[in-house]
Each structure stands twice: as structure tokens, then as C-alpha cells.
Amino acid sequence: MTTLASDAPIAAVIGGSGFVGRYVTQALAKRGWRVRVGCRRPNEALFVKPYGVVGQVEPVLCNVRDDDSIAAIAEGADCVIYSVGILFATGKNTFAAVQAEGPARAAKAAKAAGVERFVLISAIGADAESPVAYAKTKAEGEAAVLAEYPEAVILRPSIVFGPEDQFFNRFAGMARFSPVIPVVGGSTKFQPVWVQDVAEATAKAAMGEAAAGIYELGGPGVYSFKELMEMMLKVIRRKRRVFDIPIPIGRLQGKVMQLLPNPPLTEDQVKMLANDNVVSEGAKGFADLGIEPEAPEGIIESYLVRFRPKGQYTDMIEAARSRQS
């Protein structure tokens, strides 16, 4: 696409420069939408501008704790998409502020501005009765959105993987230096979902191609935490021991580590790891959206190859050695 229609629909993607949000932005831009990318530091989100033609994708100042900035980004939009989430709290960015109050503010502002559609990216495991702050506030955010938009589409992905993920990348980086990969709750089940598939589902919802309701998004396979680590190690060709840490010990570690500025583990995260993170039986999902999700085996190699002993040249070096022997 080299030109943009004068009457192109407008999407306000709050969190549009984040891991999932940037792919949502790309998906909408490819479909001819104008996209306002809501973020706290627009000058650090200029990388989104080339996702479309000149003027199609623009970073816009938006703080989920500020009513005025949310109202501004929603004004004149055809769809508001909330794609903000955190794994640990920092300062004023608490779970309640970001995952419960933020969606509530966005939905109220969108409704006041006459926005037709609202899409919330939540997470599998959202539960108002959960003792886990992450899961509880995700559910509270969903309820707040549905109070304003009963016709909203809520997407609950399992763990999301892709080039910028903080799952495979983090553990692959650890494998560079550590002979052991420690995991808390090694038997916990996940249903990894490709970020591009989540973005495709979001775009369909924004365009009115998804019925109202909650969709649980999981990939085609279910794996234990330990199996995912073994898959990652096979891709990066490093032999490491995957050491399973019992949940009670993990909680103690989380209590200590969560005091760090950028904690690798928190007590809340350990609580989440005590439960499987897979699509519920009977839940609406990708099939209802006409999407066939991709498995991680065929994708993670494309971005984890840099963690191999010789990086992208590992295959070339091994082939040369094989010919010499």
C-alpha cells in the first residue's frame, strides 16, 4: 500500500509500542487503518512509524493513569484497543493501576467519545477470586470494560512468544552462561501462542469480524514448562540441565528477588506457576476467528539462533568441520 484512503478507519492502540501492541499496530496498518500508538514516551516509539505510509502510524502520548491523555487518544477513533500489562509492579504502576483501572479509564473514555468497538487483550487465568494480583486485576479490567461495552471483544492469550518475548529470550540468554536452567513448577502446562496470531485475532476484532465475548488463545500444542526449556535448548544447541524448583521454595526465592529493581522472579509469578495456563474446555478461541495458530517449533529458531555457541554461523562452522573429518 502506497497511499492511505482519506476515510481510513482510526484505531487507538494503547500500549501499541509494546511487545504485543507493535504487532497489532502492524496488522492494522497493513489493513489500511490509521493507527494512534498510545505510549508514555512517544520519542522512544518512533520505530512504529515505518509500519505504514507517511502519517499512517503515529506515536501519541498516553498514560493509562491519566484520564485526559486517554480521552485525547480515543477522540474520533473507530476502535480502541487496550494492550497494556505488567508482570511486576513498579512505583505507581501497580497491577491495579495498569490492569484494572487502566482498562476502566479507557473504556469510559471510548464510550464518551462514541467509539464503536473496544478490544481488550487480557490473559488466560484472569479470575476475580484469584489470590494472584496479576490474575485478579486482569479480571477486574475485563469486568470494567464489559460494564461500558457489553459487546466488547476480550482476548486471553496463553504465554506469548515472538522475537521480543521475555520468555524464550530470557532463558536462552541464561543458558549462555549458566550450566543449569532453574524453573519453578517444571510440570506446569502452557499453550504458547505466536504474537502474530494474537495480532491477527485483535485485528479481526477491531474490524468487527469477531462476535462479542471472551476468547482464549492458545497455540496448537500443550507443553510443560520443562518441555519448553528443552525445546529452547535444542534450538540453541546447548546442553544444560533443567532443574525443577518446588513451588514452596520458589515462593521464598520470589519474596527475596521481588525486592530487586527488575526482578527475574516474584512471589506473585510463582503463585501463577502453580496453575496450568491452557485454554479452558469449551472456550471460544482461534477456531471461532478462522485462524489456524502456529506452533513454536517452527518459529523460535528464527530469533533464538543468536544464542547458539557461534550464533548464526553455527551451521556453517559445523558443516565445514564435517567436510574436513
Name these PLM-found stretches.
Residues 2-5, 201-268, 280-325:
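Mid/C-terminal beta-alpha module of Rossmann-like enzyme folds, strongest
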Residues 4-33:
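N-terminal Rossmann NAD(P)H-binding glycine-rich loop of SDR-like oxidoreductase domains
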Residues 14, 38, 83-84, 118-124, ...:
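SDR active-site strand-loop-helix element
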Residues 21-23, 100, 139:
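Residues forming the Rossmann-fold NAD(P)(H) cofactor-binding site
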Residues 33-43:
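Conserved glycine-rich Rossmann-like NAD(P)H-binding loop of the short-chain dehydrogenase/reductase
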Residues 42-105, 109-112, 124-128:
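NAD(P)H-binding glycine-rich loop region in Rossmannoid oxidoreductase-like domains
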Residues 105, 166-167, 185-207, 212-216:
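Substrate-positioning beta->alpha
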Residues 122, 142-166, 173:
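Conserved beta-loop-beta element that borders a ligand/cofactor-binding pocket
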